[in-house]
């Protein structure tokens, strides 16, 4: 029968072409030519409609067998071709080698330093407490013996929140130091008191290598009977020894802070050795890390603590300056740059 012979010829020709194919692109073209909607085999099937019924059945069966044979041959060839392609791509791949490690995150250096500082003071008997970052005028200034005409109240140094009180006066702000928590804690707790307060503080300052508008501070407060300047110096010297090591020089100098009397500035020797080009110490050889002093009697009296019976000391340190001194970092802005090349060193 001519139709069956035609189907057989198409099948044999298709299988011969399939055998010679080595590329997946050519294989897809073969599929369209012999198994697609407009394929040669489909064209042969259209001619069966004019045949007598018996011949049509025989030719139809032959066509279905041919199509099944071609589909099976195509799938087999496709599988073999894909395996060969995969093997050629991975010819130089050693699957016994370990995989590439996934990048692991690190704790931010400021978080590390905060944890280390609070751990040191905890071992010295201090409790760790936290306070609000949005403060009121009373706790941030007035209760700490900072009068209304003090420069720190000016808009140029304080971020005031545009929310006037009933008198039309701005009295809500982003805290300029962690010292307000001194007052809040003493309002609710009686001596003996020994606390440290870590947290973010905000000041409207020009940005440079050692100053930024938002930074981290740790406040310390001790109130008890018989507390003296010797206790303050001993505590801070011990902290500096544990954090910086015994070989680092520590300097105490008189300074003024409204909420302490007397006040001192504590500085640590710079890693540069006093070089004039140093952007951290500016050639002085020292970097101030904290201000401290004996708690002013007016501060104690405001919270109902008898300043005749109790004395205390307080200190506040900028945490960013500690790793700057320890690791020789010359720009405080690096801590907030989100540069992973810098951060993954710690």
UniProtKB/Swiss-Prot annotation:
InterPro entries: aa-tRNA-synth_II, aa-tRNA-synth_II/BPL/LPL, Phe-tRNA-synth_IIc_asu, Phe-tRNA_ligase_II_N, Phe_tRNA_ligase_alpha1_bac, Phenylalanyl-tRNA_Synthase, tRNA-bd_arm. One of its GO terms (molecular function) is tRNA binding. Signal peptide: none annotated. Binds 2 magnesium ions per tetramer. GO terms for cellular component: cytoplasm. Mg(2+) binds at residue 261. This is Phenylalanine--tRNA ligase alpha subunit. The keyword Transport does not apply. Its cofactor is Mg(2+). The keyword ATP-binding applies. Belongs to the class-II aminoacyl-tRNA synthetase family. Phe-tRNA synthetase alpha subunit type 1 subfamily. NCBIfam families: pheS. PROSITE patterns: AA_TRNA_LIGASE_II. GO terms for biological process: phenylalanyl-tRNA aminoacylation. It is found in: Cytoplasm. Tetramer of two alpha and two beta subunits. Pfam families: Phe_tRNA-synt_N, tRNA-synt_2d. It catalyses: tRNA(Phe) + L-phenylalanine + ATP = L-phenylalanyl-tRNA(Phe) + AMP + diphosphate + H(+). SUPFAM superfamilies: Class II aaRS and biotin synthetases, tRNA-binding arm. Its main location: cytoplasm. Keywords: Aminoacyl-tRNA synthetase, ATP-binding, Cytoplasm, Ligase, Magnesium, Metal-binding, Nucleotide-binding, Protein biosynthesis.
